[in-house]
Amino acid sequence: MEEYAREPCPWRIVDDCGGAFTMGVIGGGVFQAIKGFRNAPVGIRHRLRGSANAVRIRAPQIGGSFAVWGGLFSTIDCGLVRLRGKEDPWNSITSGALTGAVLAARSGPLAMVGSAMMGGILLALIEGVGILLTRYTAQQFRNAPPFLEDPSQLPPKDGTPAPGYPSYQQYH
């Protein structure tokens, strides 16, 4: 599957780090706002303050974690593109598995295997959905079969009028 709007590999890492950080801050901000609101003392003022405080403290941390994941994933993906010489879904699946394993390395080999499997499965699902969507949308833009005219509506070839029309040859 070709990706048309992707940057070349050195800049792709920076681009993916920034995108992942942004996703983490926004998603984490929404989640932390709800969590801070629910865990604050009773009263709308306390709840809004608790919500804002939770977002201020936790959203940048979550964004940083997402940025680390995105940067490591893109680095491994670019390395695989360079190593294999082609860009295909297997690079992303392998990158997801290796990223999961590397990030879980401090937790031991069992956690590494579990995280590698989860990363690979997650990326396989994402790539599979992307391929299915590409195939589905490609079918929508196929050329339509040529429109064939109804032969009963075409004028006759031998000069006689079509049925229901008078013959004007008698007036010549």
Swiss-Prot record:
Component of the TIM23 complex at least composed of TIMM23, TIMM17 (TIMM17A or TIMM17B) and TIMM50. The complex interacts with the TIMM44 component of the PAM complex and with DNAJC15. It is a multi-pass membrane protein. Disulfide bonds join C9-C78. The lineage of its organism: Eukaryota, Metazoa, Chordata, Craniata, Vertebrata. This is Mitochondrial import inner membrane translocase subunit Tim17-B. The chain crosses the membrane at residues 17-37, 61-77, 113-133. One of its GO terms (molecular function) is protein transmembrane transporter activity. GO terms for cellular component: mitochondrial inner membrane; mitochondrion; TIM23 mitochondrial import inner membrane translocase complex. It is found in: Mitochondrion inner membrane. InterPro entries: Tim17. Belongs to the Tim17/Tim22/Tim23 family. Essential component of the TIM23 complex, a complex that mediates the translocation of transit peptide-containing proteins across the mitochondrial inner membrane. Expression is abundant in heart and skeletal muscle, intermediate in brain, and weak in pancreas, placenta, kidney and liver. One of its GO terms (biological process) is intracellular protein transport. Residues 146-172 are annotated as: Disordered. Forms one disulfide bond. Keywords: Disulfide bond, Membrane, Mitochondrion, Mitochondrion inner membrane, Protein transport, Translocation, Transmembrane, Transmembrane helix, Transport.
